[in-house]
């Protein structure tokens, strides 16, 4: 089934968790009801091997399996965005596996290597694009310290369709948008809470981990922003802010923990998170999460 990739990129990029079984092995089949619920609510583009999917806790073999299995679960119902990254050879291998699985586009994680040069990043992205065999690419930018010109150089590479902007710097985003081809889609990579200020300078769409638990709220926020109703969007965001506040604790180390704990409360056992993510929630965190879920009739 054909899909409009540009429309999907400017929609909700729903970052799926990676479920584990009782032995700690990946269990992608457990995503089926979560994925079905997200699609029914209107999530535009599921994302596999993102940070909410504990990408850096997975082996490359596991990440390759996840993209194949999620593509099979999705079965063409929406375009699949597949995260790739780590060492360049791992990233290229995962790009090839993602293309073979039927992903619609690649999301290239910004290299976390301590010794990264802007021009080396260009070479890295070129290699991954080549390995992807022509799949469109979204760049995942979590650090804008490379500067506007370096960002523009990356966006000028053939195949780059969008940027997942995950830094809380709207003015730098505005400068980057001005410096790049107007055909590039700039997506808020900091979830629902940061969507309004980044929309104000030109971003469209946002990433979401909430979609695993409450996709209807994510869809309502996107709809409000799409019609320019910032008052309603902010009202809806206020209602889900406690969820994101708990996720941001412990240096963001409870980010995935909260999502998996909420899913467990909803009857979807996706296992624990892997270290170095925190597991389980503290009693105080769990009590706040339980209160949030109860207040919104989510459990």
Give the positions of each predicted feature:
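Alpha-helical structural signal in soluble globular domains
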Residues: 41, 65, 69-73, 97, ...
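C-terminal alpha-helical cap/extension of soluble enzyme domains
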Residues: 11-17, 35-37, 41, 200-202, ...
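A general structural signal for well-ordered alpha-helical segments in protein cores
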Residues: 31, 63, 67, 91, ...
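Active-site beta->alpha loop and helix N-cap motifs at the rims of alpha/beta catalytic domains
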Residues: 2-145, 278-279
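Short, flexible micro-motifs
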Residues: 14-17, 27, 53-56, 86-88, ...
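Short secondary-structure transition/capping segments
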Residues: 58-61, 93-94, 118-121, 150-151, ...
């Amino acid at each position: 089934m054909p899909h409009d990739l540009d429309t999907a990129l400017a929609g909700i990029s729903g970052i799926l968790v990676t479920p584990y079984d009782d032995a700690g092995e990946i269990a992608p089949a457990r995503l089926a009801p979560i994925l079905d619920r997200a699609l029914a609510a209107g999530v535009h583009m599921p994302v596999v091997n993102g940070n909410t999917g504990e990408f850096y806790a997975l082996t490359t073999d596991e990440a390759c399996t996840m993209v194949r299995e999620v593509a099979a679960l999705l079965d063409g119902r929406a375009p699949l965005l597949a995260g790739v990254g780590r060492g360049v050879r791992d990233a290229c291998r995962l790009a090839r596996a993602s293309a073979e699985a039927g992903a619609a586009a690649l999301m290239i994680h910004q290299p976390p290597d301590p010794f990264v040069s802007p021009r080396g990043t260009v070479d890295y992205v070129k290699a991954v694009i080549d390995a992807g065999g022509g799949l469109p690419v979204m760049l995942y930018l979590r650090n804008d310290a490379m500067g506007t010109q370096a960002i523009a150089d990356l966006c000028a590479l053939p195949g780059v369709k969008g940027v997942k902007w995950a830094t809380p710097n709207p003015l730098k985003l505005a400068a980057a948008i001005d410096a790049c081809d107007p055909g590039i889609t700039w997506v808020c990579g900091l979830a629902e809470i940061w969507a309004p200020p980044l929309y104000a300078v030109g971003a469209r769409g946002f990433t979401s981990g909430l979609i695993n638990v409450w996709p209807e709220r994510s869809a309502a926020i996107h709809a409000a922003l799409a019609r320019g109703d910032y008052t309603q969007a902010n009202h809806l965001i206020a209602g889900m802010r406690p969820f994101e506040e708990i996720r941001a604790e412990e240096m963001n180390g409870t980010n995935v923990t909260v999502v998996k704990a909420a899913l467990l409360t909803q009857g979807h056992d996706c296992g624990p998170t892997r270290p170095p993510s925190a597991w389980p929630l503290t009693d105080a965190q769990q009590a706040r999460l339980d209160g949030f879920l109860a207040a919104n009739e989510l459990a």
